[in-house]
Amino acid sequence: MPRLAYLLKKFPRLSETFILNELLGQEALGADVTVFSRRPADDEPRHPQLARLRAPVVQLPPSKEVDPWGELFAEGDDELLPRVRAAVAALRPYGHPRFPSLLAEAVLLRRLAREQGVGHVHAHFATDGALVAHLLHALGGPGYSLTLHAKDIYRDTVDARLLDRLVAGSAFSVTVCDANVEHLRGMLGADALSRVRRLYNGIDLALFAPDGRVGDADHVLSIGRLVEKKGFLVLLEALALLAREGRAVRATLVGEGEDRALIEARVAELGLSGRVRLAGALPQDVVLDLMRSATLFALPCLVGEDGNRDALPTVLLEALAAGLPCVSTPVTGIPEILDGGRAGVLVPERDAPATARALAALLDDPERRARLSRAGRAHAQRCFDLAVQAHVLHGWFAQALAAAATPAAGRPTCTSPA
């Protein structure tokens, strides 16, 4: 049976727990997986669950170190050079600035995929890795599928024409929430849309099961990369409002990111230094312990100035499964996570007073917190069970791998767009 390959920008990556979960879910169902990492992994904590992963991780060399012509001549395939020419002609109109280096990656990956016995490639995010997968297939390599998330479809810089081509060339393209599907309806043509399938990310419900612990009083937990779209500055404003009311609320913010200095400065400006702890990046076992000791979870996500946003924040899924009452915003797929407000509290984005009121109301009402805890756990069991989601995805991969064994399996067209 051909192998399944994941083509990722970096692996492992602390902030991409959903990818590790997905890989473990596929292996649990018997998939034979190889991971191709396009860049070296960052020096950061590792999730303990990584030790369970059996898949080999193949580190690709930097594209500037790849000799595409040497690879081409080494292949000895008379059809390869014409395919390269056709791919270059077809994609030249998009003017992708890194196209030459991505083509070099695809040529190298063609050989590596054959050596690894790869029959299908899956890429997360419709960014450079997806284009490499598309080129790989156009050069005679295995077919591919995609998972579309948020930055790859919402940012102002997204090229809708190229996105349409990548999705249309895929065996199928997953996206992680219904809100994304609706957004894609306005971006993609009929052929590409026919390949889009909604599948929620799944989490390990046994790992995140509530343990019956009573959370610390007035302890708000928030987790995410320290970037604009997570809404941490709004959360700090809300906490400052609660502090001015004389409440003894405290908060732990878990994560690292480009806005750390900005957030640290704002903590000091608002007089929250004794109340807010920036814990940095932490592995999943430590995060789980924090979830079980907090009173509630808050993540006031927002749409960034560049259009970027969260689609289906994994930490909200985890908090929900752990029975931690959640406060968030109606951005993208978050209402789907919180069941339209039945499994958590939704407040307007960028609204610190509304966020403060929601936090205060929950901190003052243990019975409501208990109701939301039960409702959140039940909703996670219905919609975000890793075992269930893995089965669905496994079936799609099996179909793609079976199609790969058929000589008539199609390839992306190598004609230029009109």
Regions found by a protein language model. Give the residues of each.
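Acidic donor-binding loop of glycosyltransferase active sites
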Residues: 275, 292-307, 324
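Carbohydrate-associated surface elements
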Residues: 179, 202
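A short, well-ordered alpha-helix in the C-terminal region of glycosyltransferases
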Residues: 275, 354, 361, 368-383, ...
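Conserved donor-binding/catalytic core segment of Leloir-type glycosyltransferases
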Residues: 212-240, 252, 297
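Nucleotide-activated donor-binding/catalytic signature segment of Leloir-type glycosyltransferases, i.e.
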Residues: 264-285
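Conserved acidic donor-binding segment of nucleotide-sugar-dependent glycosyltransferases
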Residues: 340-341, 345-352, 361-367
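N-terminal subdomain of nucleotide-sugar transferases
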Residues: 1-64, 114, 142, 168, ...
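Short hydrophobic beta-strand element within catalytic cores of glycosyltransferases
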Residues: 316, 321-328
